[in-house]
């Protein structure tokens, strides 16, 4: 029986969870931290707000957002991998944060009422979901009017030379890193496949608009190795 994308991705993240944080730093040369910081600076996150971090994984972005909004705010992190959440909960406890809740759930059907959150974030997760548009629509639904979505993910450089280097790195080098650092060649081969199939920056911006978002914009990081897309839910008239 053919394995669905959702089943395959779930199996990948359940297996690589113990080494995920270390591999993230190895694969991106620790640039993922810089990309998040650049994104949050542009978001202008307000204190005391309510945040949803979709596909939160091991809670890196959940923790950064919790520190930014302060103790009066609240962050809910959601992921479908219990093993990733287990690592995330340990990190939240270690950081002594009391305004973060990590829950098991599916990004395709967010278990929240409409208009619940001031900010929704998703970092390196959208490319792994079965239906990009369904998840974009769900994130739009749970945003409050005036709320903001920020999505960081890998992208596809257009700079001649760098594009070829980037593609070769993801296709051939990254799985080898996975084999030697995490004993997971097969799983890291899947991650490069999901990166290769993910829409480019301009197309993803169009999808944001199709999902209902306004004032959509995006920035590229590190020559297009990744990109952040921003979108807002219009305030009710």
From Swiss-Prot:
It catalyses: a 2-demethylmenaquinol + S-adenosyl-L-methionine = a menaquinol + S-adenosyl-L-homocysteine + H(+). GO terms for molecular function: demethylmenaquinone methyltransferase activity. Keywords: Menaquinone biosynthesis, Methyltransferase, S-adenosyl-L-methionine, Transferase. The keyword Transmembrane helix does not apply. GO terms for biological process: menaquinone biosynthetic process; methylation. It comes from the Bacteria. Gene3D superfamilies: Vaccinia Virus protein VP39. The keyword Transcription does not apply. Coiled coil: none annotated. Belongs to the class I-like SAM-binding methyltransferase superfamily. MenG/UbiE family. Methyltransferase required for the conversion of demethylmenaquinol (DMKH2) to menaquinol (MKH2). This is Demethylmenaquinone methyltransferase. It comes from Listeria monocytogenes serotype 4a (strain HCC23). The gene is menG.
């Amino acid at each position: 029986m053919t394995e669905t994308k959702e089943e395959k991705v779930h199996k990948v993240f359940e297996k690589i969870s113990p080494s995920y944080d270390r591999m993230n730093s190895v694969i991106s040369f620790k640039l993922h931290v810089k990309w998040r910081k650049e994104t949050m600076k542009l978001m202008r996150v307000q204190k005391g707000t309510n945040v949803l971090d979709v596909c939160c994984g091991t809670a890196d972005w959940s923790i950064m957002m919790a520190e930014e909004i302060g103790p009066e705010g609240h962050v809910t992190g959601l992921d479908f991998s219990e093993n990733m959440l287990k690592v995330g909960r340990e990190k939240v406890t270690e950081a002594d944060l009391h305004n973060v809740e990590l829950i098991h759930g599916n990004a395709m059907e967010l278990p929240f009422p409409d208009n619940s959150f001031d900010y929704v974030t998703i970092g390196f997760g959208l490319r792994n979901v079965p239906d990009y548009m369904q998840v974009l629509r769900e994130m739009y639904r749970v945003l409050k009017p005036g709320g903001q979505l920020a999505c960081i993910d890998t992208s596809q450089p257009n700079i001649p030379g760098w594009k070829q280097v980037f593609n070769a790195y993801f296709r051939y080098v990254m799985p080898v890193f996975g084999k030697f650092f995490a004993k997971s060649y097969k799983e890291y081969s899947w991650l490069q496949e999901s990166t290769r199939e993910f829409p480019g920056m301009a197309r993803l911006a169009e999808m944001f608009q199709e999902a209902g978002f306004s004032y959509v914009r995006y920035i590229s990081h590190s020559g297009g190795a990744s990109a952040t897309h921003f979108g807002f839910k219009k305030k009710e008239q």
